Amino acid sequence: MKTNHREIKSYLVIINSPKGSVENDNEEFISLTLSAGTIISGITYVNIKQFNRNTLIGKGKLQSIKKDIESTDIDLIIFNKDLIASQERNLEKFFKHPVIDRTRLILDIFAKRAQTNSGKLQVELAQLKHLSTRLV
């Protein structure tokens, strides 16, 4: 994840739901982000019982994150949960920064590391399938 030979500064939003092994999942997500070549400029942990269908997280936490990122130099916000297209759009509009989810992060890592033509094509196909769900 490099643009113009400059590492991307990311802000992580780690959502902990009642299900799952929180600590291992969080460590894995942070490792994935670092593997993508980003610099982690900030992290927010969100404990959630019920997901908001418009933004995944509630208004109070959104405001808290927005305040946090306004005082931080970031290029990208990465969520550890999968986002549906409308959530991604709503979050980008609210934060005024690009937002990606865990799936997009993993696809970007694969794209960066693919070496054979076949591998590159397979990754590109997976990326296009993922992006096709974001078309309106």
Language model features: what each stretch is:
Residues M1-D108:
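N-terminal accessory targeting/assembly segments
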Residues L105-V136:
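Extended, highly charged alpha-helical segments
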